[in-house]
Amino acid sequence: MRCVKQVLILAVLLLMPCLVQAGYLTPDLQAKLDQTSPNDKLKVIVRMAEEADISVFPQGQWEAMVQYLKDFAAISQTDLLATLPRYGNKVSQIKPFWIYNGIAMEATKDVVLNLLRRPDVGCIEEKGIIKIEPLPGKKEPRVNGLEWNIARIQADRVWRELGYTGRGIVVGNIDTGVNVNHPTFGGRWRGGSNSWFDPINHQSYPYDDNGHGTHTMGIACGGSTADSIGVAPGATFVATKAFDASGNVEVDACMQWYAGLGSAAPNIISNSWGVIGNSTHYWQITRNLQILGIHQVYANGNSGPDSGTVGYPASYPHHIGVGGTTTSDTLASWSSRGPSPYFGAIESSANYLDPVWASSRRKPDLTAPGLNVRSAWYDTTYRVLSSTSMSAPHVAGVMALMLEKNPNLTDPQIWQILTSTCDTFSWGGPYPNQNYGWGRLNAYRAVLATPPSGVDEEAARSPVSRLPFSVRPNPFTSFFAVPGHETECFSLYDISGRRVGTYRGDRIGEGLQAGVYFVRAAKGDQKPLRVVKVR
């Protein structure tokens, strides 16, 4: 029966979509092989020639997508996994993955070259080393007040004036762990086996033996509205340990764990790590997480001030990359700059957040405070650190505020709102550019520009909802069509609430600069239609 079942599954999978790539060694691994003695083993990742494509599944079909990824990987890796034991002690630490179709292992040079000749192998790359080292800082006591960075992005205005703190939203991280008992978190770790993963030391309860992970999570959702170091103090969180002090990395395992959580997966994963270069290793992994409905944000890196220093995955066009600013809103000297490396035509540019990224390769997408940021440490103290590692969780926190207001936001919508509501300055322009992106994060403007959840349903209950006009394509466009209703009155407001024009007919918004605007439609003495956001 098992044989029949495998044949049937294989027959089905052969009809399912997949991505195919030709076999090659990455340049970094080729250089390393040239310097490796015959008996030494290298940490490598063998990518299969075919990759499952879950983008064709209907949105929200998480269980079917994950099962397809697992089945596709299991069947396509079967023959290779059966072959590896023949190499004896030349191969060890074999670990198959399904979040991408590949196998991590330690192997000698001759084994690597032999595997490359297989028709089912598409690429072999070196498993990278990422060191997350705590930056020098001074321990400081808790201060009863706002930190400069929280006030700078106006997160406190979101709590006070708009009433959003991230409540009901779950933030995850891929970092050095988190001390969930730190007083700043106030019991907001979600708890349970689906809220912590440690592929490094396999501990069952969260911990952080470094400090970096606790610090970054504190920025995203630490503290409270009365005494806050965090942007979204009402959010809960889950955590993983992907790094240790020796540079061992288990990012792939953490991403796969998140993908397997299903309805328990976090809304957002904050990533304060990256690798210099133009590798596409995380491309399919992060795309799969995105398709599964998990929002992600990545630190741009700390290799500035030269251009072209942005690390990956922040450099990928389907995710948000964040640079770092100082207390005076200038770009930090160490903040990595664009442009991104050229990755080739890996997939349709329709999946890119920035519509013109293919030509501009612009990164970062935006910046956030990264210098002298005070947050929680791995014990019960606080520490001031500087890095784009500190910048990225600011954006993750703002995303939590936005998602509390509207949990149905898509990645393109989030990107559009964040970039169109940034603060820009007389220096560093014109914007957007390869240093600041679209500008510095503004939490208040971003949440204000976020359309409330269920706006269509509320509009349907309004007397004016019978006006049959639509925004095409919804929700972001430079125009919208109002067929057959030239007599309606439309008022447009900018992000500050200032009315910028009143229109009749079919030239609504004509002459306005690109940006986010609010539209109110009225007819006669009827009540205005609920605010609709367009670009």
Regions found by a protein language model. Give the residues of each.
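Protease zymogen maturation seam
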Residues: 114-170, 182-184, 331-343
